[in-house]
Amino acid sequence: NTVVNDYVVRAAEKLRSEKQKSSRISVFIRTSPFDDNESYRAIKSYSFIYPTDDSRDFLYAVRKILPKIYRPNYRYSKAGIMLSSFSDIGYVQNSLFNESHTYKMDSKLMQVIDELNLNQKQIYIASQNIGRFKPIQRNMISPRYTTRWSDLPTVK
């Protein structure tokens, strides 16, 4: 759950940096496709009434979705999220019942968090995987001959 929450927060940060909002989030989990004994995969989506870029909204949706697709006693090998139904931040249609003053405060809060986290993570949302997240290890990666000069082999 905490790894998925990290993905959600990172996706929301990217969404805000691109001045976009999303009105749909999908969460997926699966076991290894090579393990014949226990194969399981599931995906479920949550649609918002109004497009959002708020990390807390996406985390709320994940808390609703995960219990519906999670099955105990499986060894999951992959989990992830997908955002869809994008709209530009300036083209969001408001409703008569939409509380725009809270939207402005929420937007400002996310902006402040993004500014503080710009160079180094300083603020986390409580459900994130603080300090336990291991970045992808790149010690077994293949050389990038076509995109990096330093990876080209030299002939002597």
Where are these regions (language model features)?
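Basic, low-complexity intrinsically disordered segments
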Residues: 1-156
